[in-house]
Curated annotation (Swiss-Prot):
Short name of one Pfam family: Ribosomal_S13
Family: Belongs to the universal ribosomal protein uS13 family.
Function field: Located at the top of the head of the 30S subunit, it contacts several helices of the 16S rRNA. In the 70S ribosome it contacts the 23S rRNA (bridge B1a) and protein L5 of the 50S subunit (bridge B1b), connecting the 2 subunits; these bridges are implicated in subunit movement. Contacts the tRNAs in the A and P-sites.
Single biological process term from Gene Ontology: translation
Name of this chain's protein: Small ribosomal subunit protein uS13
GO cellular component, one term: cytosol
Region (Disordered): 92-118
Subunit (UniProt): Part of the 30S ribosomal subunit. Forms a loose heterodimer with protein S19. Forms two bridges to the 50S subunit in the 70S ribosome.
Amino acid sequence: MTRIAGVNIPEKKHIVIALKKIYGIGNVLARKICKKTGINFSKKVNSLDSSEIELIRNEVLKLKIEGDLRREMTLNIKRLIDLGTYRGLRHKKHLPVRGQRTKTNARTRKGPRKPIKK
């Protein structure tokens, strides 16, 4: 397996799909990386030579991905909580943050139902 940014990339997949295995790289960003490096989207990872892999590694290293991105996201949420903003309070209470209703939905965010004690 080829390693890019500390992640094992599947060998038998197309390069665009394989790059999506890295946290922080989606379809659009994977295509941009391929365009910048001049690699065909339909090329498979096992058919890339070492120079092409190095080009991709260099492009990926310029981005904020994996642990850095996760750390930044948690720090952003922690900052909102520390400031005492409405969004921070919603994060703290494990409720939807972006204005969704909570009377009937929001089970994913709230977690499983808690039984009412009689």
